[in-house]
């Protein structure tokens, strides 16, 4: 049985117990959230050594890091290094988006080495394999699509992105309304090209029950991809995006009725004043299923700094209902991320997630900040470094800027606020 089926039968699984402990809640509380579809617990029966984590309403905001090869950079070793760096930086999930090299070997090694849940986009590999076979990208068959999906599930992917909501009707809406950037989702563009070439409905939509049967067998969580997500602010919250979201809402119910865990993916590029509306729409139209957002990026003009534009949007999105943030690295829109880009992306997204958890009242979030405040008041530098979201960087910067014997730090020097106020408040001053 899947975690959803177990939850509906009143069974608290060992995975639920482990995930609940990380949240500071009981297994029964988590079971109830999973049973009604407001939380998912992605844990493929074939992913050995997984540390189960739940995603959903009332739980801490989770962060995903995308890694994976490209045709230009097909080597496995750098991606395993990125996995290690992301996990060390506190990521909760990894997605392997590989399109270069030995994709099967890369995916299997990432799943084998990852202690956190792993997601994939099977359609990417189907497209690559079709191209390698000397055929046009639109010449992949229905059977090849579903065989590719089953292979990823069999290998242990805990969740898979599937672009089931990109239908002929949604594409007609796009044609009628128009957009600045049309379709920026790789999976969405592949499916659209396939449908227009064959003049047929999306097989992932048309044969959705076939997909559900595969997911049910391996207890794979479906992540319903947003193929019409906006790729720029000008396209945000438009007709094609919302029409697809309505379609995804109906697919959420069908998955849950079949006993399959399901979450929904969201935008994208969204201006600040539209983010809360987008989160409310998604939660309402998709029956409070967990919502997984890329960013959202709040401006289009900051290549090289999109980990910042994403963190701004992510904090607002998560505080408004999003449950899962996909990181964005400084390399977004520019090229494949390096190991350092991966770490920066994870930390930026974790900052956004934590800022939102403070608003949502997640257990332990407020206490973390309070402990930092107390450490600062006490001028306890080792404690401050320990409590930092990135202790390595904080410690390195502290050491580079200050001598161990200094009474004050180099920011304020003899004008230290702590020393000044201690003279009048009677608080002992230890020095920095």
Swiss-Prot record:
Pathway: Cofactor biosynthesis; thiamine diphosphate biosynthesis. It catalyses: 5-amino-1-(5-phospho-beta-D-ribosyl)imidazole + S-adenosyl-L-methionine = 4-amino-2-methyl-5-(phosphooxymethyl)pyrimidine + CO + 5'-deoxyadenosine + formate + L-methionine + 3 H(+). GO terms for biological process: thiamine biosynthetic process; thiamine diphosphate biosynthetic process. InterPro entries: ThiC (IPR037509), ThiC/Bza_core_dom (IPR038521), ThiC/BzaA/B (IPR002817). Zn(2+) binds at residues 269, 333. [4Fe-4S] cluster binds at residues 409, 412, 416. Its cofactor is [4Fe-4S] cluster. The keyword S-adenosyl-L-methionine applies. Pfam families: ThiC_Rad_SAM (PF01964). GO terms for cellular component: cytosol. One of its GO terms (molecular function) is 4 iron, 4 sulfur cluster binding. Keywords: 4Fe-4S, Iron, Iron-sulfur, Lyase, Metal-binding, S-adenosyl-L-methionine, Thiamine biosynthesis, Zinc. Substrate binds at residues 66, 95, 124, 163, 185-187, 226-229, 265, 292. Binds 1 [4Fe-4S] cluster per subunit. The cluster is coordinated with 3 cysteines and an exchangeable S-adenosyl-L-methionine. The keyword Ribonucleoprotein does not apply. Its EC number is 4.1.99.17. Belongs to the ThiC family. NCBIfam families: PRK13352.1, thiC. Catalyzes the synthesis of the hydroxymethylpyrimidine phosphate (HMP-P) moiety of thiamine from aminoimidazole ribotide (AIR) in a radical S-adenosyl-L-methionine (SAM)-dependent reaction. PANTHER family: PHOSPHOMETHYLPYRIMIDINE SYNTHASE, CHLOROPLASTIC (PTHR30557:SF1), THIAMINE BIOSYNTHESIS PROTEIN THIC (PTHR30557). This is Phosphomethylpyrimidine synthase. It comes from Desulfitobacterium hafniense (strain DSM 10664 / DCB-2).
